[in-house]
């Protein structure tokens, strides 16, 4: 059985900061709490026997840093492969804007539809069909290995960690081919530092759990 862990990077704003909509064009590092969340992610993976065999992130520093810290805290020395398909979405005119300005432009209803149904607001430079295709292709490759000697494709069993951002993570459950059922059972957003777990068994993907928030107080 292949296990796919989707994790959101840790915090990029401190408690007293004014947060903005951080997208693909805003490359921010983790703040101290974000580093603690990354460490808690690693501890969670270790405690729950979810040590990753392969690790991926986006090309943005907040995801690479989260992955690196998580691996340090779960004792895994695997490299982190940064892929652009996991970069956060481009929020267009709302990139790096405060939430009140975003709502003033697109309206609260559009933002609610984004958070509950993954319907992309007008003006954002993002194609959800491309994101879904990327997840499907990645998930398919994650479950198969090609034996170049025999030219046979085998099913594989491993644990894969992907550290990405909120906008991209919500499209991962499309690999189950029943996103509506997922959205009825779970909130589609991942909190900062949170993770979701998908498993491939009986030739299909299932969401085992979503928006798990590891306790940063556990060392």
Give the ranges of each region predicted by the language model:
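Phosphate-coordination/substrate-recognition cap region in phosphate-metabolizing enzymes
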Residues: 40-115
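Beta-strand elements within well-structured catalytic alpha/beta cores of enzymes
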Residues: 3-7, 56, 157-164
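An N-terminal RHG(E/S)-centered segment typical of histidine phosphatases
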Residues: 1-52, 68-72, 76, 204-219
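Active-site signature of alpha/beta-hydrolase-fold catalytic machinery across serine-
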Residues: 69, 171-175
């Amino acid at each position: 059985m292949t296990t796919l862990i989707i994790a959101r990077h840790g915090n990029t704003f401190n408690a007293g900061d004014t947060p903005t909509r951080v997208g693909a064009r805003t490359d921010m590092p983790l703040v101290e709490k974000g580093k603690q969340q990354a460490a808690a992610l690693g501890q969670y993976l270790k405690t729950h026997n979810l040590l990753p065999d392969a690790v991926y992130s986006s090309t943005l520093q907040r995801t690479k840093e989260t992955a690196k810290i998580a691996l340090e805290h779960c004792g895994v020395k695997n490299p982190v492969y940064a892929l652009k398909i996991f970069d956060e979405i481009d929020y267009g005119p709302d990139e790096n804007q405060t939430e009140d300005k975003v709502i003033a432009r697109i309206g609260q209803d559009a933002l609610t539809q984004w958070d509950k149904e993954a319907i992309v607001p007008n003006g954002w430079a993002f194609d959800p069909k491309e994101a879904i295709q990327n997840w499907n292709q990645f998930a398919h490759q994650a479950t198969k290995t090609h034996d170049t000697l025999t030219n046979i494709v085998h099913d594989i069993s491993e644990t894969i960690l992907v550290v990405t951002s909120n906008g991209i993570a919500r499209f991962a459950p499309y690999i189950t081919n029943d996103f509506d059922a997922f959205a009825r059972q779970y909130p589609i957003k991942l909190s900062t530092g949170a993770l979701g777990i998908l498993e491939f068994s009986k030739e299909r993907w299932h969401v085992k759990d979503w928006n798990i928030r590891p306790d940063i107080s556990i060392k």
